[in-house]
Amino acid sequence: MLVIRSLTSALLTHNQSSSIDSRPSPWMTPLAYALGSWVVLPSYFRIHVTGQENVPRDGAVILAPTHRSRWDALVVPYAAGRFATGRDIRFMVTADEVKGLQGWLIRHLGGFPVNPRQPAIASLRHGLEILQNREMLVIFPEGGIFRDKQVHPLKPGLARLALQAEASQPDLTVQVVPVYLDYSQAFPTWGCKVNVRIGKPLQVADYTQGKPKSEAQRLTADLTTALKRLAGTETEVMETVNGAGESMPVCLQHGQMHG
């Protein structure tokens, strides 16, 4: 999974649309959810979900999970998708993550491939379209898989996209929902325990009064704090985000970093 790393002025205007189609299939998507939720995940993991009531049942929503495993693309729909909340989920994935059985499930659960190094404008527009259509989009704000339990510095792309969407329609009311994923094993195997903790949503409209750059930084900082609380981490330090000299809080836990 990846985070959108940059947004440009070429992003969606009201009369533009992307060429990407990630709409759920009327018959394949229910099958994928059934296989994932009733067969694959329950037979492989022991999953415990808390905070499902915090996922809005309608409106434009960005789910912002930590990223610990390729399995996340199946665990998040299990915890917050069709069978849990009545809502379908869309999310961006790397090309490698749409291969094999896992990839088949991911594609039919709403995943669409994006180049993580040079995401096409069409991919960014599609993410914006999803929010403008008041649907639910998953963005992994850490920007990559980290196999420890720390909350790593968040990339700024999620906040920028959220603010871009909020500015595009005055009544859109975009919400960002923090999600902490915790696996009992760094490289999950059969019987691994998975805890999914879903926090209260952040209202993007609360971050529209100042300059876009500073408000994006503030939203990113508040999302980091929310993820830290879900993780139960204790030590907060300032880290540089994406090498750009922008400081954001990141929470550290004791223990060795694996990823």
Model features per residue range: what roles?
Residues 29, 36-67:
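Helix-to-loop junction immediately C-terminal to a conserved catalytic motif
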Residues 57-118:
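Catalytic core of membrane glycerolipid acyltransferases/transacylases, capturing the structured
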Residues 21-46, 99-109, 189-190, 259:
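Alpha-helical membrane-targeting segments
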Residues 49, 63, 91-92, 176, ...:
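Generic preference for hydrophobic
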Residues 4-16, 20-24, 28, 121-259:
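Non-catalytic C-terminal accessory region of glycerolipid acyltransferases
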Residues 45, 117-121:
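A conditional alpha-helix N-cap/helix-loop micro-motif detector
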Residues 49, 99, 121-124:
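Structural motif corresponding to alpha-helix initiation and N-cap regions
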